[in-house]
A protein has these predicted regions:
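An N-terminal assembly and electron-transfer interface module characteristic of large anaerobic redox
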Residues: 1-220
Length: 220
């Protein structure tokens, strides 16, 4: 340890004869656990955690500690302003063919619950803040979900459309979305986006889940 070299030995709970080459069950478990950790460290190395937005409502758990991510996890934190989603929606920077497929799948399989505000006489400050027509909510959310995925992982389709930088992505391993309150006070929230990113399936079938934090909750 004086040379700062990590030594790691695996010992069984029971003493073995010196010529016994079998691997006890408890040692086998430790070896497999160590190997899984090694694979995880190698897989995460130099990937990124993408903060879409910043600290949510001053919540300490939503503060991305760059030193912890870089030094302990080997992940580089990156930040993307939430307005990037608005820019890509406005300019149509997403796969339009996949949008049609995703929207049709969502409308068929994702059933809405009841509207808790139905019939209420809401103040103008609230009704005025609803800038996306309720009938267009799912269109917006579908585009937002595709765009978030593209920000994290890139998309060759965008390169074909001429958006070369946007096509690259951030080589992400995980991400989070601020939302509250600068976004959700006037735009559809990211609940569906967060759920489908963390899901093991979407409109394309089975997929690997992506950890995606509500409120950019990196420290919890």
């Amino acid at each position: 340890m004086r040379k700062r070299v990590c030594l790691h030995s695996q010992f069984t709970a029971d003493v073995q004869d010196k010529d016994d080459s079998t691997i006890p069950a408890d040692v086998a478990e430790k070896i497999i656990r160590f190997a899984k950790c090694a694979v995880s460290v190698g897989w995460m190395k130099d990937k990124s955690y993408v903060n879409i937005g910043g600290v949510t409502m001053g919540i300490a758990g939503a503060y991305c500690n760059a030193s912890f991510f870089q030094k302990y996890l080997g992940i580089r934190p990156e930040w993307v302003d939430m307005t990037e989603i608005c820019r890509r929606i406005t300019l149509g920077i997403y796969d339009h063919d996949e949008y049609d497929k995703a929207y049709a799948w969502i409308k068929e399989n994702c059933k809405e619950g009841f509207d808790v505000n139905a019939g209420k006489d809401l103040p103008e400050v609230i009704t005025k803040s609803k800038v996306v027509d309720p009938d267009k909510d799912w269109e917006f959310i579908t585009k937002m979900t595709l765009i978030v995925r593209d920000i994290l992982f890139g998309n060759k389709k965008l390169d074909e459309m001429g958006w070369h930088e946007e096509a690259l992505g951030k080589n992400a391993v995980a991400a989070g979305f601020q939302g509250q309150r600068n976004w959700t006070d006037w735009l559809p929230n990211a609940d569906f986006t967060e759920s489908i990113m963390a899901s093991s399936f979407d409109w394309n079938g089975k997929k690997m889940p992506t950890p995606f934090a509500t409120e950019n909750d990196t420290l919890n």
